[in-house]
Amino acid sequence: MKTIGLLGGMSWESTIPYYRLINEGIKARLGGLHSASLLLHSVDFHEIEACQSNGDWERAGEILAQAALGLQQAGAEGIVLCTNTMHKVAQAIETRCDVPFLHIADATGRAIIAKGQRRVALLGTRYTMEQDFYRGRLQQQFAIDTLIPEAEDRTRINQIIFDELCLGVFNAHSRDYYLQVIDALAEQGGEGVIFGCTEIGLLVPEESSPLPVFDTTAIHAADAVEFMLS
């Protein structure tokens, strides 16, 4: 089994499922008392969010690249960045580290193609929904088109993520709102929906969604398990 390095804390609420899912995946594959060989560097999200708000992505990339290098030096044979949004600075990490970087959009793209879909809705932070680092990669690497909510909805979705989900607040009103947005995107031709923020799956159960769900946390964790056992 390879040792995986998890770069988490953004938020820590969604890093917990990564740890659980990877361990469950290893146990399911190997049985007995087997568990995941992994390292975790959990950053202070306050510092990262300040970089996001100020548009200082270079500084954010430097912080995460240094943390990833520390994981590599500690024995990690691959790096998993446990957040969608911060894949905006994935190149900084890939440049600094010599070990494989398991990109969340690549894992998600493969999962979408495996289901025979090419046009999917995308929910996430405003950075993930509006900027090209995620949607562009899905289009360029997999020819997947993404539908995003209207501007007003994007603002509210982002606000719920940072003011509620990242703080461990999960309420029914916000859940219902997300489901309404998914409904609207289904009417626009969405074949599935990407939960493109690792906290969304904590709020919206897959079985309640009007569209098939691509939960990036679960997909990314499964990709990590495959890498570890390859």
Spans of model-derived segments:
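Non-catalytic structural scaffold of enzyme domains
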Residues: M1-S230
